[in-house]
Amino acid sequence: MTYPDKTVYPVASCNDQDFKNLMDVYLDAVFNPNITKYEEIFKQEGWHYELTGKDDELKINGVVYNEMKGAYSSPDEVLSSQIYRSLFPDNTYSKDSGGNPEYIPKLTYEAYLDFYHKYYHPSNSYIYLYGDMDVVERLEWLDKEYLSLYDYKKVNSEINKQPAFDEIKNVEAQYSITMDDSQENKTYLSYNRVVGDSLDEMLYQAFDVLDYALVSSPGAPVKQALIDAGIGDDVYGSYDAGILQPVFSFVAKNANASQADEFESIIENTLKEVVKTGINKEALLAGINSSEFKFREADFGQFPKGLLFGIKLFRQLAV
């Protein structure tokens, strides 16, 4: 599971022996991968030139390359990348953790190995166990088979905070559509702010509630104001607290590019009015109840609870 500032390798099983086998397989894959021995794996999984016939066009192929080409065909993925790039130009969040297909072919095998050997070390990792198991036995096995084989290594993987900008930045980017699609009302408008620190749990809870009260609930003030102005056919908010400096966004999909200034003005004026008159108490209570229910229910669908609890823990380790 690739995140902007970490990669998670989770394993889970209700069968004890299967769980032990999976631990061994994944730990071996992370710390002793064959890709560091065979460049052919890098070419297959990363990128390579491919010529199927002497008269055919030389093409670029590769598992990750094709995956990211597919991802970049999604306007939502492009928007997400552009939000990070515009807000965090001076740290790692400006780079797409999955790889930008435009730049993937510039990655050499040597550069890949340098990166792997620099960061992929037990000293630069967190390993956690969750569930009904013999924890002491698992820790002893982990130390004997893997951790004791390494000396401690100081790895500088600290992420520097992005300083605040002196003024608002306006950024334009493009995404692809089919030849038959009209460009009319295909613009995504996004208003984004960096808010606080991921270690501030109270702030995280507050913005989770504010997201509901301001833009997600029926008749939410920001959402309703944009809808009444005819800006976009889908308005939503998002609060990303999974990185060092959380981001709050308002987004209008399928809008007109000429509405950008009005979009910004409506959001700021509506927020000022909310500050002056207060948030609707019913919406606020509904947001609090929704947030509390999520925590009490702890229903993560197809994902094991231990995995999601761990991911939440990693959010607190973003520094």
Mark where each language-model region is.
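Long, compositionally biased
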Residues: K169-V171
